[in-house]
A protein has these predicted regions:
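N-terminal ligand-binding/catalytic initiation module
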Residues: 1-89, 291-301
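Adenosine-phosphate binding glycine-rich loop
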Residues: 2-3, 230-301
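Gly/Ser/Thr-rich loops at beta-strand to alpha-helix junctions
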Residues: 14, 69-73, 99-103, 133-138, ...
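Glycine/charged-rich beta-loop-alpha catalytic/anionic-binding loops adjacent to active sites
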Residues: 86-94, 124, 253-255
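A glycine-rich, Thr/Ser-enriched phosphate-binding loop motif common to dinucleotide/cofactor-binding enzymes
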Residues: 95-113
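Short glycine/serine/threonine-rich phosphate/pyrophosphate-binding segments
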Residues: 104, 135-141, 163, 207-210, ...
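Glycine-rich phosphate/diphosphate-binding loop of Rossmann-like nucleotide-binding domains
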Residues: 114-198
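Rossmann-like adenosine-cofactor binding region
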Residues: 176-258
Length: 301
């Protein structure tokens, strides 16, 4: 009898994400096994239980997905699986906490494409501001943009120290060069975007972060991307399906365009589907996080 494909879903939170479960089933996995409240120190043993219970030939039909809501923890868990592998007993692993890796990759890829198409510019050398920058999507967005050469600021809505700490932590981990900023009010938001080329809005759903008055202070804005699909939009003037639509509220910034949440979400959905399929189809184990996600996202926009 043919071996069925199994996805072991490790999550440090009390519940696994129904979104990820649906995506994994639709990508072709036969059996999904969710694990909640998983501790970092248990990853090694869980991984070895997964690899040694099937023959090396069946390893291609076994994979691990790491969820949760903490980017650092998810990457730590992914790294913890690697020394647990004993070739030829090894499986593929994909970390995507709260969909942060795939959402961020889709967001940056969409903004990058718009930047090239409408302004003939690259991420390298651009100034990027990430609102909601201390959350998982914001952190991944910031790291991706920074590694591509953008001067990147992670923005927290309450504390400059939180933003600086996040930037320092992830700079050290991934070789990025981000800085921290704070936006407690419209004046601070306006100061941050005044000379920004790119604005990424990755704040909580249903919160208007950038209003028309703030946008009007942007003097060199080229592209803004908003991942908030719950009204009101995170950036006023960007509609859900906008894909490089004129951002007229940024009236000091010539030819500024916006990318909306559903346009980004369509790429994110395709991307997560493709990365899950990649684990099923790979001849050799793959280890996937936001870096591999961004590489793939560029082929989908």
């Amino acid at each position: 009898m043919a071996k069925r494909s199994i996805l072991h879903m490790f999550d440090p939170m009390p519940n696994n994400s129904p979104f990820d479960i649906n995506m994994a089933l639709d990508a072709g996995f036969d059996v999904l096994m969710p694990y909640s409240n998983v501790k970092l120190e248990t990853i090694h043993n869980l991984t070895q239980d997964a690899i040694f219970s099937r023959s090396p030939s069946a390893s291609k039909k076994t994979a691990i997905f790491i969820g949760g809501r903490d980017m650092g923890m998810a990457i730590d868990m992914l790294q913890a699986t690697k020394p647990a592998m004993v070739p030829p007993f090894e499986v593929s692993v994909f970390a995507d906490p709260s969909g942060a890796c795939t959402t961020a990759a889709a967001l940056v890829a969409c903004v990058e494409k718009a930047l090239k198409q409408h302004h003939g510019k690259e991420l390298k050398g651009s100034k990027a501001v990430v609102f909601g920058g201390t959350g998982p999507v914001g952190i991944a967005t910031g790291v991706i943009a920074s590694l591509q050469g953008a001067e990147t600021i992670l923005v927290d809505h309450l504390s400059i120290d939180s933003a600086k700490d996040a930037a320092k932590q992830y700079n050290r981990r991934f070789g990025a060069t981000m800085s921290g900023g704070v936006a407690r009010n419209d004046e601070e938001k306006a100061a941050l975007i005044a000379d920004a080329d790119l604005v990424f809005c990755t704040a909580k759903a249903g919160i208007r972060v950038i209003n028309a008055a703030v946008l009007a202070q942007a003097k060199q804005l080229k592209v803004a991307g908003d991942v908030n699909a719950v009204p009101p939009s995170g950036i006023e003037g960007i509609e859900l399906n906008d894909l490089s639509a004129p951002l007229n509220l940024a009236n000091q910034a010539t030819n500024a365009v916006g990318v909306g949440a559903l346009a980004i979400g369509n790429v994110k959905y395709q991307l997560q589907h493709e990365l899950l399929k990649m684990m099923l189809e790979a001849e050799k184990p793959v280890f996937l996080d936001f870096r591999e996600a961004f590489t793939k996202a560029r082929t989908l926009v």
